[in-house]
Structure formats: structure tokens, C-alpha cells
Amino acid sequence: MLRIIFFTLFCLVLNAKEISPEFSLKTSGAVTDFIVENNILYIGTTASSIDIFSLEKKERINSITIPKIKDFLGDIIDAKIFSVDKINNKILILSQGENGGRNIFIYEDNKLQNIINAKDRLFIAQAKFLDDNHILYALLSNQIFIYDIKNSKIINEIQVSQSSFSHFVLSDDKKTILVTDESGVINQYDTKDLKKLNTFKGQNVDRVFQIDIKKDTILASGQDRRAAIYFTNGKVPFYKSFDFLVYAGALSPSSNLACVSSDENNNALVFDINKNEDKYLLTQNKAILTKILFLDEKNIAISSDDENINFYNLKIKE
């Protein structure tokens, strides 16, 4: 029976059109996170740097360097960037600190300000801007905090659950946050008061690695080898099964398409959510995928656990 299931999945993927990268960008270290704003790419790396690329020129135009750190043996090493974000002229950087702690920096006007220090021993897993004066960050212990930058204080916090934290995502308007963890459950909160609004569960039965939300559609990429789709408008949820862990995933701006890591060869599958139809197989990624991002409906950027970001144009196979 198991062989039949795997054969069926293999045949479905064969129906997807293979697409190789249109171009690639090489960074200063392994890519951990990236964002795009106004055709400018901001890339967090393992090499104590944020690399800044122009997508139009396809070249690096700047970089931000953060201080190196001492490891447990006293050796000087690069600080790994865990997450990066941007609002107006401010860039938010969450990075590895000494003794297992985390640093949060804000880069503005060519100056680097350390707003949360590794000495506080906070094991922060992810941080994003809520607005110009507030950030939202999550601890590995699955606590969510809203932090006032100007007054240097926490103004609200919640304990999501006793499960270890995996990932959070803000809605495009930043009015809600979705949080997921090792339980496979997704909780949605209002970012004004961190009041719980909804819970989505049942489609994943193990840790969810990443989540995304666009319009009324939620994508969950799971350790259970499932890509789960939930809807905030009451539509029936479903999941797609794969023969490998689904490490990363993203939704297109329209929420019509999803792209997820799909196999042990580091390929990514694009499928139509409304038709549950496999469309494209994005190939030539050389390591486990770390992030997928739709630049628009037809262009996708994919990073893996190496120094390259691949860019795919879906129009090529239309």
C-alpha cells in the first residue's frame, strides 16, 4: 500500500513542468532569511552580514556588518543572522550572541543600535517590525512579546503554549499574527492586544516548520511531510502529502498558488490551491531549502542552506 502511495505521488510530480533558475545571486555566507522591498533584496547570512542586492542590476550594492562574537571556547566567530526585516529606513536584525543569547539591532542612517543585548539571555527565535516604534519577537519557549523601541520596554506578552516555538508570520496589514510550533497547531492573534482570534489544526500532526498567509489562505509546511492549507473564510482545509519533510513554503500574492519544498533533491513544487493541481517543479537548489518567497505571481526566489538564492520565472513554461 505504501508503495502505491509513493508511486502516485511520484506520478503527480511528473506532471509538473520543470523550471531551472533564470538567474542566481551569490551571498557572503549561507542564507538564513531575506526580504524584498522596491526591487531591493535584503539577505541575512551566517557571515555576520546583511547583503543588499539590486534585483534590477542583479548585483550586490551594499552590506551591513554586525560585530563578530566569541564562542564557548573563546574563539572569534561570525554571528549568524536569524531574521531580518525593514520598515521605512530602519532595518531590524536578529543575530546570534555570546553564551547562547541573541542580539537585536536596528540599522538606520548608517548606524547600528543594539536594542536587545545577548547579555539578557533571551533565546529569541524570530523578530519583525510591527510599526515604526514597535517590534514583535518570539522566544524558543513559545512566548510572544511586543517591545516598545523608544521606551525600551515590553508592553505586552503571551505564552502561546508549552510546545516549542517554530515560526510566526504577520498578515500583510500587520493586524494579526499567526504562530505555530511543534504541535502542528496554528494560533492567530490580534496584534493590538494579543487576544486570540482563531485556531487552525487537524491537517498537520507534527511540527510545522513555516507558515504563510495571503488574503484568506494559510499555508503550513510540516515535519509530517504535509503541506496544509487552511482558510480564514470557512472553506474546508486540506493537505498535500510528500515523501520528504516540507521545510519551507510560501503563497503567491493572490493566494492562488503555493510553493513548497517537496523532495530530497531540494526541488520545490508549485501547485494551484483552488484546483489542487501540480504546476511547476523548481530545480537546481543545492541544499535544504530555508525560504521561499513569491516576488509576484510569476517570479519566485528560493534560498537554501548555502550561499545562493535562485530566481525562477514561471512564465517560461506557459
What are these regions (language model features)?
Residues 23-50:
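Beta-strand-rich domains and repeat architectures in extracellular enzymes and scaffolds
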Residues 20-26, 59-74, 111-118, 153-159, ...:
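A short beta-strand motif characteristic of beta-propeller blades
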Residues 41, 91-92, 135-136, 177, ...:
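Hydrophobic beta-strand positions that form the internal "hydrophobic ladder"
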Residues 288-318:
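Blade-level signature of beta-propeller repeat domains, shared across WD40, Kelch, NHL, RCC1
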Residues 49-53, 99-105, 143-146, 185-188, ...:
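Structural motif
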Residues 55-58, 107-111, 148-152, 190-194, ...:
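Short loop/turn segments that connect beta-strands within beta-propeller blades
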Residues 34, 82-84, 127, 168, ...:
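Hydrophobic core register within WD40 beta-propeller blades
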Residues 36-38, 86-88, 130-132, 172-173, ...:
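Residue-level detector of Asp-centered blade-edge/turn motifs that repeat once per structural unit
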